[in-house]
């Protein structure tokens, strides 16, 4: 049985991992959280799972086969609001794990990184040859988020003797998403739930949403991997465009869509026309998604 510690267990991805891992007898979970009120939420979400939830100051007192780090400010609303804390929070918990690994080198560290590390305009999808381009003279909330992820990944590669996998997540969606998070799909679902017209601009874009089942499959493959220090772009079987999403939602839920001038909206994390990767390096750890976006 693999003993797995999860940092950021009350977040969107953390909840998904709990939902899958608690139903698999191969895994024993130790969850870590800073917010006791959110801990109660986890107990309510998974009442039959007998969750073990600890505070972070207890982390070093135990041993783990795997540590999964889901900590981070990820939704557009919070990135804009708390951008000054992004680097500080990410650095603190990442260092905590790195220091643990140096004393326990057999432990595997799976870190949730982001496609934002490329810090590009995403005029086209990225691949294994895409460089990271930083405009260091014009920092904003978008760059601080990217810098936080770049900082972590760089540190991980420098510690090449440690077992670390960085998973660059571009888009992820599930029933555990917070509908006030400011993501395109969460706003779309809010419109459907409230029988409201969905207003958007006339600019199309492409996204790649990994299915939770595929994501769990990827995590299992990572857990079974030994002696590795690498990064992987996460992808589904096929991406999807905004226009197709709107068409599907309109047909299935009678959603009324109003298209207005493209300059009427701006994203707090910057516009990304093709926010996905065509890298298939993850095949190295036998990952093959079954589901499209």
PLM region descriptions:
Residues 154-207, 212-216, 249:
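NAD(P)-dependent short-chain dehydrogenase/reductase
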Residues 137-165:
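Active-site Tyr-X1-5-Lys
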Residues 4-24:
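N-terminal Rossmann NAD(P)H-binding glycine-rich loop of SDR-like oxidoreductase domains
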Residues 96-142:
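Conserved Rossmann-fold NAD(P)-dependent oxidoreductase catalytic core, especially the SDR/UDP-sugar
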Residues 50-91:
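NAD(P)H-binding glycine-rich loop region in Rossmannoid oxidoreductase-like domains
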Residues 195-196, 200-293:
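C-terminal substrate-binding subdomain of Rossmann-fold SDR/epimerase-dehydratase oxidoreductases
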Residues 82, 86-97, 101, 110, ...:
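Short alpha-helix in the Rossmann-fold core of NAD(P)-dependent oxidoreductases
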């Amino acid at each position: 049985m693999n003993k797995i510690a999860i940092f950021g267990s009350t977040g969107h991805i953390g909840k998904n991992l709990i939902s899958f891992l608690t139903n698999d007898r191969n895994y024993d979970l130790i969850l870590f959280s800073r917010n006791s009120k959110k801990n109660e939420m986890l107990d309510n979400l998974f009442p039959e799972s007998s969750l073990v939830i600890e505070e972070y100051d207890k982390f070093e007192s135990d041993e783990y086969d795997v540590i999964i780090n889901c900590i981070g400010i990820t939704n557009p609303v919070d990135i804009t609001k708390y951008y000054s804390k992004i680097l500080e929070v990410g650095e603190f918990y990442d260092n905590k794990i790195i220091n643990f690994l140096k004393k326990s080198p057999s432990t595997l560290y799976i870190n949730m990184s982001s496609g934002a590390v490329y810090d590009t305009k995403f005029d086209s999808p990225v691949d294994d040859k895409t460089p990271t381009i930083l405009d260091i003279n014009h920092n904003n909330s978008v760059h601080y988020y990217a810098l936080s992820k770049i900082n972590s990944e760089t540190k991980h590669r420098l510690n090449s003797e440690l077992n670390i996998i960085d998973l660059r997540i571009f888009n992820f969606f599930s029933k555990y998403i917070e509908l006030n998070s400011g993501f395109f799909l969460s706003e779309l679902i809010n419109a459907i739930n409230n029988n409201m017209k969905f207003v958007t601009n006339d600019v199309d874009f492409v996204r790649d949403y990994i299915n939770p089942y595929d994501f769990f499959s990827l995590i299992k493959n990572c857990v079974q991997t030994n002696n590795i220090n690498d990064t992987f772009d996460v992808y589904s079987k096929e991406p999807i465009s905004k226009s197709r999403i709107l068409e599907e939602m309109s047909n299935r839920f009678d959603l009324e869509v109003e298209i207005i001038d493209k300059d009427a909206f701006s994203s707090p994390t910057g516009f990304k026309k093709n926010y996905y990767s065509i890298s298939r390096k993850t095949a190295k750890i036998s990952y093959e998604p079954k589901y499209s976006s």
